[in-house]
Amino acid sequence: MTWRSEHIWIELITGSRKISNFCWAFILFLGSLGFLLVGTSSYLGRNLISFFPTQQIVFFPQGIVMSFYGIAGLFISSYLWCTISWNVGSGYDRFDRKEGIVCIFRWGFPGKNRRIFLRFLIKDIQSVRIEVKEGISARRVLYMDIRGQGSIPLTRTDENLTPREIEQKAAELAYFLRVPIEVF
């Protein structure tokens, strides 16, 4: 979502609360729970899941491996649910031409650096840069080159923008900030 006026441009960034992350976390949770139940039922010798009899799965080695995969999947699933609940990666980009300041804010993982806040002057921005990597997994990322601080990515690497969309976004931002565009 973007909000613009004559002097201020605010772009809200969605973090890890995306539909795909919810789906993957849910599928991974159910799958790993199934693996753990199968491993546990082979250990107990009782049928906890009615899809197939427990006599078909011997605890050593199949039951142990299934239990291990189930536990590992539950850990990964809990990691995904935590990143979703903390909304890691969300935030905003605020470009204020009137005050001459750019503010970039992102939420991180809990701890000392939970709030990531970058603030610098518009006059320190050298250019808006588009980095394009073509191939099987094409990637187009929009960067802002800052004098003395390097490049700051403005779009996520998993955000699959078409060439037209990334060019339009870069052109609008470069026009708003009155800086040149570079393409690599």
UniProtKB/Swiss-Prot annotation:
One of its GO terms (cellular component) is chloroplast thylakoid membrane. Disulfide bonds: none annotated. Signal peptide: none annotated. The keyword Thylakoid applies. It is a multi-pass membrane protein. The chain crosses the membrane at residues 19-39, 57-77. It holds the Pfam family Ycf4. GO terms for biological process: photosynthesis. It comes from the Eukaryota. Keywords: Chloroplast, Membrane, Photosynthesis, Plastid, Thylakoid, Transmembrane, Transmembrane helix. The keyword Transport does not apply. It is found in: Plastid, Chloroplast thylakoid membrane. Belongs to the Ycf4 family. HAMAP family: Ycf4. Seems to be required for the assembly of the photosystem I complex. PANTHER family: PHOTOSYSTEM I ASSEMBLY PROTEIN YCF4 (PTHR33288:SF4), PTHR33288. This is Photosystem I assembly protein Ycf4. It comes from Atropa belladonna. The lineage of its organism: Eukaryota, Viridiplantae, Streptophyta, Embryophyta, Tracheophyta.
